[in-house]
Structure formats: structure tokens, C-alpha cells
Amino acid sequence: MTAQIIDGKAIATTITERVAKGVKLRIANGLRAPGLAVILVGGDPASQIYVGSKRRTCEAVGIHSKAFDLPETTTQDELLALIDKLNDDPDIDGILVQFPLPDGFDQTSVIERIKPDKDVDGFHPYNVGRLAQRIPLLRSCTPRGIISMLEYIGTEFHGKHAVVVGASNIVGRPMTLELLLAGCTTTTCHRFTTDLAHYVKQADILVVARGKANFIPGEWIKKGATVLDVGINRLEDGSLAGDVDFAGAKERAAWISPVPGGVGPMTVATLIENTLFACNEFHSQ
């Protein structure tokens, strides 16, 4: 068996095209384009690349992107004051703060300062809580993007055992909630999990967000499983690798997402989808 590839780039394109149509429809009806504020503190090269990708995607679909590139010397109070200002700006539907922030910032306070109806990253405790209560509004971008990928390939969720490796607030925890909402039986593995292989080998749907290249050996993959690899790791030769041994896993899985070109594009596509949703649902004018 050789796995079919889940083409995140192609699926993301269908989402961005749908968002672009939604933006055009708003404008045709005499409404303003959605607005997204993107805040970057400091000059971390990886963060600059991610922010650039988000801004370009916004422009491509007609969303008004407002950039705030702040120096590394910015204080927590200054950042919170900017968020307060954007919370009150009627032309801004979403506020995105690029993480990680430089040392000295309290990330939780920053997340909680963003109004829940402008939290297009889906990180605010209010939005995560709504997902846990099965009444989601703005949903965390990477987990929601993965659900979109699974839906696109026709995944049957009910009765399936979904295993999530990683328990971060950004991916692992909301991913478990999304899969639970979809009807899966879920297991979340983390650094205190003993006998990780035991759980991975049971997974009909496996989502790995560990941040370590080739962390999951191919021989652990259940035959016929669907594998979503969130990791993106740069190897010594400069190439990129996921958290799953792709070469080994694709010989056992039915479906697998590649790195790059898998989950990554879906995160950005879901961000702009959230921005249009916030505009239409909460701030439409």
C-alpha cells in the first residue's frame, strides 16, 4: 500500500477562492472589505516569513491587512495598548499577534486582551471554551484546517480512534476537541505518556504536533490510517521534514499529509476564513 497524498496546498486554494468570493460579495453589496491587523514584535526571521505569508494571502483575497511591525524594545504595556486600540477600531475584524513573543512578554495576557470576536487565531479561552462546549465560533486555525483536510478527502469520523501526539494550547488540545466534536474516540499523548507506540499503532486518524523531525517511525503507523503531520523541522542539509517518518509511513497509511505542502497552507487559509466569518457575524457594516 502506498498512501494517497493530502494536498494541503490545493485544499487551501479552494478555501481562499471561497473567501475571495465572499469578500467580493460584501463589496458588491456596498459593505466594506474585512480588515485584519497583524502585529509582529521584534525581527525573528521565521516569524517574518510567516507574517509575510499571511499578509500576502489577505491581499490576494481582498482582505485589508494592516501591518504593525514593532521593535524588540516594545514593552508589554505598549503592546496591550495597541491591542486595545485595535479592539475599538470598527474597520478591524481580526487581530493576530505573531507568536512567539520576545522574552519578557506574558503571552497569556496578550491573548486574553484581544476581544473574543476579533480573536481570529482562536486562542482566547472564550473561544476554546466554546469549542469544548460544542458551540464553536472562532476556531484555532491549525486544528480547524486539519478538520477541513479530513472532510475534503471524505473521512468518516464516527467510530474512529483519533490519536493526537502533542498537547500544546495552539495545536494539540484544540485538535483533540475538534476530533471529539467530529465524533471520534480520542486519545491525546504528551511528554508524560508511557509506551507512545502502543497508542500510535491504534490510530485510525493520527495527528502529530511534536516539533521533532521523524519522531514517529513509519512502522508504528496502523495499516490504512490517515496521518496528518503538523511538524516542520529543518534538517542539517537544509531540507524540511515533518514529525513523522514520511518514507516509512506512506507505505502503511491510506492518506498522509506531506511536509511542506500539507498542514501549513491550511493554517493560513483558515485564518482568512476566520477573518471573513468574524466580519460577517460580528462586525458587518
UniProtKB/Swiss-Prot annotation:
Q: What is its EC number?
A: 1.5.1.5, 3.5.4.9
Q: What is any one of the record's Gene Ontology cellular component terms?
A: cytosol
Q: Per UniProt, where does NADP(+) bind?
A: 166-168, 232
Its keywords, alphabetically, are:
Amino-acid biosynthesis, Histidine biosynthesis, Hydrolase, Methionine biosynthesis, Multifunctional enzyme, NADP, One-carbon metabolism, Oxidoreductase, Purine biosynthesis
Any one GO biological process: tetrahydrofolate interconversion
PROSITE patterns the record matches: THF_DHG_CYH_2 (PS00767)
Q: Which GO terms describe its molecular function?
A: methenyltetrahydrofolate cyclohydrolase activity; methylenetetrahydrofolate dehydrogenase (NADP+) activity
Q: Which reaction does it catalyse?
A: (6R)-5,10-methylene-5,6,7,8-tetrahydrofolate + NADP(+) = (6R)-5,10-methenyltetrahydrofolate + NADPH; (6R)-5,10-methenyltetrahydrofolate + H2O = (6R)-10-formyltetrahydrofolate + H(+)
Pathway(s): One-carbon metabolism; tetrahydrofolate interconversion
Q: How does it assemble?
A: Homodimer.
Q: Which family does it belong to?
A: Belongs to the tetrahydrofolate dehydrogenase/cyclohydrolase family.
User: What PANTHER family does UniProt report for this protein, alphabetically?
Assistant: C-1-TETRAHYDROFOLATE SYNTHASE, CYTOPLASMIC, C-1-TETRAHYDROFOLATE SYNTHASE, CYTOPLASMIC-RELATED
Q: What function does the entry list?
A: Catalyzes the oxidation of 5,10-methylenetetrahydrofolate to 5,10-methenyltetrahydrofolate and then the hydrolysis of 5,10-methenyltetrahydrofolate to 10-formyltetrahydrofolate.
* The protein, known as: Bifunctional protein FolD
Q: Which organism is it from?
A: Psychromonas ingrahamii (strain DSM 17664 / CCUG 51855 / 37)
The gene name on file is: folD
